[in-house]
């Protein structure tokens, strides 16, 4: 028998946020700043930000590459053309390396603080 232990929910959690982007050069800085504020006081969460560039024709990829050089948490999946949000999410889910993976919108329609609430419920057995 082989046993595969799950995440140590009381210890440090490796969390991947999967962020599909299409022509979002105006939203990326705000998104990263908000995520940084939300997770600044969470020592038990290590973040991986998986941005999936879904064939953007603006400077989205250029900005992401610049951000990645300065921030080792950032990973980029660059799709060859616009495949749509579902395909971008699928590519990001495949690339994510965290113990927990959460898709989130770069436009902040779903506030990142909700992710912390979800983690708290998860750690409490929900």
Regions found by a protein language model. Name each.
Residues 1-126:
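Structured catalytic core of nucleotide-sugar glycosyltransferases
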